[in-house]
UniProtKB/Swiss-Prot annotation:
Catalytic activity as recorded in UniProt: 4 porphobilinogen + H2O = hydroxymethylbilane + 4 NH4(+)
GO biological process: protoporphyrinogen IX biosynthetic process
E.C. numbers: 2.5.1.61
Function per UniProt: Tetrapolymerization of the monopyrrole PBG into the hydroxymethylbilane pre-uroporphyrinogen in several discrete steps.
Keywords: Porphyrin biosynthesis, Transferase
GO molecular function, one term: hydroxymethylbilane synthase activity
Organism per entry: Psychromonas ingrahamii (strain DSM 17664 / CCUG 51855 / 37)
Residue positions where S-(dipyrrolylmethanemethyl)cysteine is found in the record: 242
Subunit structure: Monomer.
Protein name: Porphobilinogen deaminase
Protein encoded by which gene: hemC
Length: 310
């Protein structure tokens, strides 16, 4: 009998490779005889590094090439940071597995200052995220936001070389790369609401590939699935991409889901925050309802302005 094989499409960055190898080790833990191959590749978002992400344009900057590999039969699954995954999938593909979420916070990283509040007037902060930018500027309009691209090591090197007074990164990425010592402080969600799906790893697969989906089942985390379902439902209703100032974060306790949402202008002068609570079985509807509340308060106009300037 021929051993089963799974081919994993992944980005080539150190963090993406860590995530793919993590999925490989998890699969082998549950299926010791499985053959698992990695297929590293570069995406559009990896190649175009001299332009802010919001200006590159299009959805799926970090996933499209991986999806093509699945559709063409070169790969069976793709491993993603869920915050990079668009709300719409190519026909026949879906997020069939969502793994247990790591820390979803944004991390403040600096060699000289302990937190955002301590930065001097006119300090230079590095990020490529409009979501982080709008929330930082809402708190500290005096701060200068400077675009920051590249993998985690590249971004840290730029900080260490003095290009920035501080940079903002996803805490989960630093933890996965065993660089938690570089986290100066975690930023509270009240200050910087995380991105939709931040800290969670998802697996994309052909929806008709029942054999592969069955192999992936032990990697599914039901609690994370509920939380991500609510966050992504909000984002879908808002028609938000990965490069827009939208934040969402769900907490699940005793079957009660607490969902926060945010839409802001790029300059931080307008920020709409809403929250909603309900039963976990209504995760999708809670996300939709929260988005409708945000839209009723002017989110549509803010997002239209963002898209117009991209």
């Amino acid at each position: 009998m021929t051993a089963q094989k799974i081919r994993i499409a992944t980005r080539h960055s150190p963090l993406a490779m860590w995530q793919a190898n993590f999925i490989k080790s998890e699969l082998l833990k549950y299926h010791p005889n499985l053959i698992v191959e990695l297929l590293p590749m570069k995406t559009k978002g990896d190649i175009i590094l001299d332009t802010p992400l919001a200006k590159v344009g299009g959805k799926g900057l970090f996933v499209k090439e991986l999806e093509v590999a699945i559709l063409e039969g070169r790969a069976d699954i793709a491993v993603h940071s869920i915050k990079d995954v668009p709300v719409d999938f190519p026909e026949g593909l879906g997020l069939t597995t969502i793994c247990k979420r790591e820390d979803p916070h944004d991390a403040f990283v600096s060699n000289h200052y302990k937190q955002l509040d301590e930065l001097p007037e006119g300090a230079i902060v590095g990020t490529c995220s409009l979501r982080r930018q709008c929330q930082i500027l809402a708190l500290r309009p005096d701060i200068i936001i400077k675009n920051l691209r590249g993998n985690v090591n590249t971004r840290l090197r730029k900080l260490d070389e003095g290009e920035y007074d501080a940079i903002i990164l996803a805490a989960a990425g630093l933890m996965r790369l065993e660089m938690q010592h570089r986290i100066t402080s975690l930023i509270a969600p009240e200050v910087s609401l995380p991105a939709v799906g931040q800290g969670a790893v998802g697996i994309e697969c052909r929806l008709d590939d029942e054999q592969t989906i069955t192999l992936l089942k032990p990697l599914e985390d039901p609690e994370t699935r509920i939380r991500i379902t609510a966050e992504r439902a909000m984002n879908l209703k808002l028609q938000g991409g990965c490069q827009v100032p939208i934040g969402s974060f769900a907490i699940l306790e005793n079957e009660q889901l607490f969902l926060r949402g945010l839409v802001g202008s790029v300059d931080g002068k307008q920020i709409i925050r809403k929250e909603i609570t309900g039963h976990q079985n209504d995760a999708q509807q809670l996300g939709i309802t929260l988005a409708e509340q945000l839209l009723a308060c002017g989110a549509e106009e803010i997002l239209a302005e963002v898209y117009k300037n991209q």
